[in-house]
Regions:
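His/Asp/Glu-enriched, well-ordered alpha-helical/loop segment
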Residues: 2-89
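Short, Lys/Arg- and Gly-enriched loop/turn segments at beta-strand edges
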Residues: 92-99
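Mg2+-dependent phosphoryl-transfer enzymes with acidic/Ser/Thr/Gly-rich catalytic loops
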Residues: 106-107
């Protein structure tokens, strides 16, 4: 459902058109259908705006979803035997590089 990185202004979801407007995803009648932000934007908001400790905001974006999906043994944490999908963040929380399975996939 993510439109991040695209110029798309709408998409279909369960037979309904969802529109991208003013940082939100809405149905035709204006009902909120989601947020239009990246994961790092969500982490940054939780930390800087709501005052959540950065470590907890990062767990909310990694470990907790992996636990909910039942894949925390291999994803969402740094541990021996876990898949090495990592995001290297700068001090300003900008994404500097990403690794997928321990292999660099993108760098700024």
């Amino acid at each position: 459902m993510s439109l991040t990185g695209t110029d798309a202004t709408s998409f279909e979801l369960t037979g309904r058109t969802v529109y991208r407007r003013d940082g939100a995803l809405r149905l035709a009648d204006g009902t909120l259908a989601g947020a239009d932000l990246t994961m790092i934007d969500a982490v940054t908001y939780m930390h800087r705006t709501l005052g959540l400790p950065l470590e907890e905001a990062l767990r909310m974006a990694s470990l907790y979803p992996a636990e909910a999906l039942g894949i925390a043994a291999e994803r969402g944490r740094l541990a021996h035997g876990a898949r090495a999908d990592l995001v290297h963040l700068g001090d300003d929380l900008s994404v500097r590089r990403t690794l997928i399975g321990g292999v660099e996939a993108w760098a700024a």
